[in-house]
């Protein structure tokens, strides 16, 4: 590796190690997508970048470079260099990158060097690293067999996945549980960040040399995060494992996920009153999201039961009344929908069983030559 340039051959190690990187692109570029270990410390802010870009189109590169120097000068330049130096002091082995590994990387590197510090920039920049991660995702179905973990709503698929080293939690990466009630407290990542995080997870999975890749049975969209097409095609052709769980355990799990966790999460973020109001709105909006499938009359019945359960919870702190609408949700919506979908995939099912039986089956599968 050249002292000042990190070659493309290092991309895999960068992603696997979570190597700290300084992204000097403008915030608007960074917010569309970046890498898990990167921090945005821009050479130019959005408005400055826009002016330089317009100048480049109208007057060419030399004029654009001159304008860039005039916009990022004096105290502004000093503040940005100081921010870079502070980052490097915290991460002495850091790399930097811009969009293509061109002028912005070179100029940033030069200014930092003038302050007495050497920092390498990544060859090809964001664009080349992003392309590398896209290829990782597209090639993943060929790297190891995919097994799809299915199971009726509330069967604990995510809990199970988190206990398995061969698993990747797609819903965790998407910050969404993949259903009408599936949103998290924090917003979903951008599509690019979802894909980049998936690619890094796949690289780590490959590094562990697992016998298979275990992922949950998902729709193409998890909330608003789209599973990349090549990877999703691999999932659609994969063998399936069906996790089975008694109804009582399913109800308790959904009460915990939809009520206890969501309520406490909103209260933690917003305070007692505003948090409860946000939690109530989450339940109401989630039912409204499936109104067309439920039908108007059943939707209204759900809203009435939920409103009553919320009133009791607010007054007495008792969450058990929520069990009524959760049970109804299973029998009238989730269970029939799941059975319909599973019937279409029966030919792909290779094992069904409880949590313990599923662990034993996968352990045996992994131990085979």
Curated annotation (Swiss-Prot):
<protein>
    <recommendedName>
        <fullName>tRNA 2-selenouridine synthase</fullName>
        <ecNumber>2.9.1.3</ecNumber>
    </recommendedName>
</protein>
<dbReference type="GO" id="GO:0002098">
    <property type="term" value="P:tRNA wobble uridine modification"/>
</dbReference>
<keyword id="KW-0711">Selenium</keyword>
<dbReference type="InterPro" id="IPR017582">
    <property type="entry name" value="SelU"/>
</dbReference>
<feature type="domain" description="Rhodanese">
    <location>
        <begin position="15"/>
        <end position="138"/>
    </location>
</feature>
<dbReference type="InterPro" id="IPR001763">
    <property type="entry name" value="Rhodanese-like_dom"/>
</dbReference>
<dbReference type="GO" id="GO:0016765">
    <property type="term" value="F:transferase activity, transferring alkyl or aryl (other than methyl) groups"/>
</dbReference>
<dbReference type="GO" id="GO:0043828">
    <property type="term" value="F:tRNA 2-selenouridine synthase activity"/>
</dbReference>
<comment type="similarity">
    <text>Belongs to the SelU family.</text>
</comment>
<comment type="subunit">
    <text>Monomer.</text>
</comment>
<keyword id="KW-0808">Transferase</keyword>
<comment type="function">
    <text>Involved in the post-transcriptional modification of the uridine at the wobble position (U34) of tRNA(Lys), tRNA(Glu) and tRNA(Gln). Catalyzes the conversion of 2-thiouridine (S2U-RNA) to 2-selenouridine (Se2U-RNA). Acts in a two-step process involving geranylation of 2-thiouridine (S2U) to S-geranyl-2-thiouridine (geS2U) and subsequent selenation of the latter derivative to 2-selenouridine (Se2U) in the tRNA chain.</text>
</comment>
<dbReference type="InterPro" id="IPR036873">
    <property type="entry name" value="Rhodanese-like_dom_sf"/>
</dbReference>
<feature type="active site" description="S-selanylcysteine intermediate">
    <location>
        <position position="98"/>
    </location>
</feature>
